[in-house]
Design a protein with these regions (language model features):
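Domain-level signal for soluble alpha/beta catalytic cores
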Residues: 1-334
Length: 334
């Protein structure tokens, strides 16, 4: 099969293999320990989330990751958004659609994005990174997608079916995308794990993604985990710049990619190549062999190496080793 050369002017990541993460880490919120922290806590200035974000940023940089996230410290990927979106109710870890979904009046995760950016900027200086190294770095926003949010929620009133709710949810989330672009995010990753389940009308899902990406100059990505056999040909046509999928924990997906790589023309591929569902260090030789298949399919300049999914359920020492495998292989192939 001939190697496809992709061109997308929006994605200026360089012609080399880069590394990123998909989302969360298992870093727990911490109670104030030092005297200074306790004083801040007593006057309402202690922010445990900032501590977790800082720890997550440093962890990723220690492991050589290029495009980092904030660690998603606020928990549930659905609840962390719907708590702030009019039309949703969130109680007992359950999301319910109770009225028409409307755009929030405030940003949701942009504060965390900006704090992660500020930590990254300081660390670039502290670590004495070269100009070339610093150019590769950046923070992306992880945004739970409208199809996943609505399919994770119970319909209680107003909507008789989910599809109109998905479209309204996309309009509600559009503000977050625009704010991320203004804040200088490296890109936005829309998390849509439900797209591989067969439960979602993919035409509606595509329309919702178009609402989020239309007119945005910043690169836009979409993460879809699970078995791609029944959805890859459709999701490869979504109006995104980066399609991120799992290939380590699912032995079907690499064959699906190899058979359909031509559909990714104009896109980059987020290549999940360490297993986020297993709390053990991956075999580096097996990961390397998998990455080599990905490179043969789409070319290293079109790939971002990352875990299959978030690493919240993986012990931190093991998560670090998984990420080190990614950065070691990126250096080797570059």
């Amino acid at each position: 099969m001939a190697l496809i050369r992709f061109v997308n002017e929006k994605i200026n990541f360089g012609d080399y293999l880069i590394t990123t993460v998909v989302g969360s880490f298992g870093i727990d919120l911490k109670e104030p320990e030092t005297l200074g922290e306790k004083i801040k806590s007593s006057i309402g200035l202690y922010d445990p989330y900032k501590i977790v974000i800082e720890e997550a940023v440093k962890l990723q940089l220690d492991c050589g990751i290029d495009i980092i996230g904030d660690g998603q410290p606020r928990g549930d990927m659905v609840g962390s958004f719907v708590k702030h979106i009019p039309g949703f109710s969130y109680e007992m870890n359950s999301s319910v659609i109770v009225s028409k979904i409307r755009a929030p009046q405030v940003d949701i995760m942009i504060k965390d994005l900006k704090y992660a950016q500020s930590v990254l900027k300081k660390e670039i200086g502290y670590r004495g990174m070269s100009e070339d190294e610093a150019k590769k770095k950046g923070v992306k926003l992880m945004l739970t997608g409208p199809s996943t949010i609505v399919h994770s929620s119970r319909l209680e009133s107003f909507y008789k079916e989910r599809n109109p709710a998905i479209i309204d949810c996309a309009h509600a989330l559009r503000r977050e995308v625009e704010s991320a672009e203004k804040a200088g995010a490296k890109y936005v990753q829309i998390d849509e794990p439900f797209l591989s389940t067969g439960m979602v009308d993919l035409k509606v899902a595509k329309e919702a993604i178009e609402i989020l990406t239309d007119g945005i100059e910043m690169p836009m990505g979409m993460h879809v985990c699970g078995n791609l056999d029944g959805c890859f040909k459709d999701i490869a046509k979504f109006p995104i710049d980066i399609l991120d999928c799992e290939f380590a924990g699912n032995n079907v997906n690499i064959g699906v990619l190899e058979a359909n790589a031509d559909l990714l023309k104009g896109k980059k591929l987020g290549f999940g190549c360490v297993d986020s569902a297993v709390n053990a260090v991956d075999d580096k030789d097996e990961v390397k062999a998998l990455v080599e298949r990905g490179i043969r399919a789409v070319g290293k300049e079109n790939m971002l190496l990352d875990p299959d999914c978030g690493l919240r359920k993986v012990d931190i020492p093991i998560a670090k080793e998984k990420l080190m495998i990614l950065s070691d292989l990126a250096k080797e192939f570059n």
